[in-house]
């Protein structure tokens, strides 16, 4: 399906190629929030080609797999993808996490979680943090097994030099590009001496290449505590997969919660952007699904495409809605999902 926005030129008048975007609605409220993002993209002065692809539990029930090969191919052939949410039932034979598998198959090695203060009353001021999480190895490598007749469960933690080098370099590059002056390398090398030890050693090597950026290291338990005590002290955090997963969800609670948390999964040949929240089955069809995180993920996607002006416009429109209380009930407002979408579109003009 090809959807062309009203204008086919950028605001500068420079012609652009249509951006090929794969939409991954998924399960639960995923289709609802992705539909909202598509509506917003339609009103921007850009040109898009949208393709919908299957992912998640609904795909598994109909196709026998939660991540069809056709979905991976669609993402590979697109400039970027927008993902909604999936339902992952535990202990279902033949079912695997399509999100983890997608990250591995497409080598989406960097998970970027911007944590910024919002105009919401629950948001703490002065926070502008980027968490850079290794996205393809660690304890999420998928190497699990049962032994001793099911009485012992083992998960292998894989940390490689290559994986550590590229995620740490990505974090320091982003710090340099965004004018940040310090980066915290978070690990648990005092206990996990081999895996975190390698990650830490690589960080110390790479940090020498960025003399203008102060490298600080912090144990993960200390970091969790410091995020509660003084989150504004952090500018960039780079860490391994599981640690980053936990810390980023913790940090987003200081700026409004999961309803405003967006994420980017970046590789060398593909990029997938998503809201962090889950599929929220009880909210399906109620009009209460919060599209804010999906809008912010869409802004991240626009930045990735080089459309920084349109990304800023969208982000500012969302923040204007938050400041005015024109939001969904989970953020203290009274708007429906579609109602908030219309407000954002109205601001964008």
Predicted regions and their residues:
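N-terminal glycine-rich phosphate/adenylate-binding segment common to multiple enzyme folds
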Residues: 61-157, 242
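Glycine-rich phosphate/nucleotide-binding loop
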Residues: 59-60, 108, 226-326
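Buried hydrophobic positions in well-ordered alpha/beta secondary-structure cores of metabolic enzymes
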Residues: 27-30, 79, 132, 171, ...
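Glycine-rich phosphate/diphosphate-binding loop of Rossmann-like nucleotide-binding domains
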Residues: 22-43, 149-221, 233
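Short, low-complexity intrinsically disordered segments enriched in A/P/G/S/L with frequent Arg
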Residues: 8-10
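Extreme N-terminal starter segment of soluble prokaryotic enzymes
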Residues: 17-21
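N-terminal beta-loop-helix "entrance" segment that forms/cooperates
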Residues: 47-70, 225-227
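Flexible, glycine/charged-enriched surface loops at secondary-structure junctions
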Residues: 49, 178-187, 210-218, 307-315, ...
């Amino acid at each position: 399906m090809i959807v062309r926005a009203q204008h086919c030129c950028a605001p500068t008048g420079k012609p652009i190629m249509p951006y090929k975007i794969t939409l991954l609605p998924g399960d639960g409220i995923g289709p609802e929030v992705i539909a909202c993002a598509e509506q917003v993209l339609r009103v921007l002065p850009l040109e898009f080609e949208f393709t919908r692809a299957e992912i998640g539990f609904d795909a598994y029930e109909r196709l026998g797999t939660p991540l069809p090969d056709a979905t991976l191919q669609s993402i590979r052939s697109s400039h970027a993808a927008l993902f909604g949410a999936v339902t992952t039932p535990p202990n279902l034979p033949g079912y695997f996490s399509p999100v983890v598998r997608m990250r591995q198959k497409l080598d989406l090695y960097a998970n970027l979680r911007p944590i910024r203060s919002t105009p919401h009353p629950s948001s703490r001021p002065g926070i502008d943090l980027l968490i850079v999480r290794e996205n393809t190895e660690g304890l999420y490598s998928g190497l699990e097994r049962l032994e001793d007749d099911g009485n012992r469960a083992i998960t292998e933690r894989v940390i490689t030099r290559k994986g550590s080098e590229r995620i740490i370099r990505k974090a320091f590059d982003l710090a340099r590009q965004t004018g940040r002056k310090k980066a915290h390398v978070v690990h648990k090398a005092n206990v996990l001496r081999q895996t975190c030890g390698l990650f830490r050693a690589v960080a110390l090597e790479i940090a020498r290449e960025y003399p203008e950026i102060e490298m600080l290291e912090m144990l993960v338990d200390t970091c969790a505590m410091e995020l509660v005590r003084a989150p504004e002290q952090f500018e960039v955090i780079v860490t391994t997969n599981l640690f980053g997963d936990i810390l980023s969800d913790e940090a987003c609670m200081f700026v409004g919660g999961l309803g405003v948390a967006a994420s980017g999964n970046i590789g060398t040949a593909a990029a997938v952007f998503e809201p962090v929240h889950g599929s929220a089955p009880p909210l399906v069809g109620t009009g209460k699904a919060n599209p804010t995180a999906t809008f912010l993920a869409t802004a991240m996607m626009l930045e990735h495409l080089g459309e920084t002006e349109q990304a800023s416009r969208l982000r500012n429109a969302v923040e204007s809605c938050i400041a005015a209380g024109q939001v969904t009930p989970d953020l203290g407002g009274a708007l429906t999902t579609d109602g908030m979408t219309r407000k954002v579109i109205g601001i964008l003009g």
